[in-house]
């Protein structure tokens, strides 16, 4: 996929870029693999806002993507590469030998007509899904499970991948895109290759309106609010924070304070943190 740049016909178009969608081969999604997606306006069941700066956006239909890849001992053919508005990566439409259709994340290099498989005996080939114990060291992988049978949870965004560094008993040592090194059960599955659409991070949205189409609302600084709205608010002119540390809107220390639960069960599987040197 390449990035196209618009002519500066207006202030909003100046420096605006977008995907050229050259890899997309089918514009309409598979109806049998769609589900309804309702907007919540970032409010919960009691009407309270649970996430700031989220609301609106274009109407979308959810694509049912297969993150588990448990249909073994059969071959699927890639029929199309499609756009998915719910994620940064593109998706590939598979048709199995028995006629079943499914979506998977489209890895880099996967093309229409390619054959993919899943299972312990699958080849080490882009798009194939195998248990981590069957994947050789040094291989780039994505869509990695954390619990057997739950489906892939790690390395699913556009352009991301992880690398197998080694094997230690019933665990496999994996280095993630962030630099974090962690242990993952060898029975968990992963897909070979990198997630495609890597240039997505280079897109310049150009104007606020495009972000509104994506469901993003304005992010207002606390320092320009009133003191009853934010701990940084108030004062005459451009006033400092006025506290020993920057604070969140709810009065908790932020900007450097670790928020991960020290007692979280999965901490023991992290060999090296993403910020470790």
From Swiss-Prot:
Pfam families named in the record: Ribosomal_L2, Ribosomal_L2_C
Keywords carried by this UniProt record: Ribonucleoprotein, Ribosomal protein, RNA-binding, rRNA-binding
Keyword Acetylation belongs to the record: no
Keyword flag Isomerase: no
Covalent S-S links between cysteines: none
GO terms of biological process kind: cytoplasmic translation
Region ranges (Disordered): 212-277
InterPro entries: NA-bd_OB-fold (IPR012340), Rib_uL2_dom2 (IPR014722), Ribosomal_uL2 (IPR002171), Ribosomal_uL2_bac/org-type (IPR005880), Ribosomal_uL2_C (IPR022669), Ribosomal_uL2_CS (IPR022671), Ribosomal_uL2_dom3 (IPR014726), Ribosomal_uL2_RNA-bd_dom (IPR022666)
Superkingdom per UniProt: Bacteria
One cellular component (GO) term of this entry: large ribosomal subunit
Biased composition range(s): Basic residues: 254-277
PROSITE patterns with a match to the protein in the record: RIBOSOMAL_L2
MF terms (GO), sorted A to Z: rRNA binding; structural constituent of ribosome; transferase activity
Function: One of the primary rRNA binding proteins. Required for association of the 30S and 50S subunits to form the 70S ribosome, for tRNA binding and peptide bond formation. It has been suggested to have peptidyltransferase activity; this is somewhat controversial. Makes several contacts with the 16S rRNA in the 70S ribosome.
NCBIfam families per UniProt: rplB_bact (TIGR01171)
Subunit structure: Part of the 50S ribosomal subunit. Forms a bridge to the 30S subunit in the 70S ribosome.
HAMAP family: Ribosomal_uL2_B
Family: Belongs to the universal ribosomal protein uL2 family.
Protein name (record): Large ribosomal subunit protein uL2
Protein's organism: Leuconostoc citreum (strain KM20)
Gene field: rplB
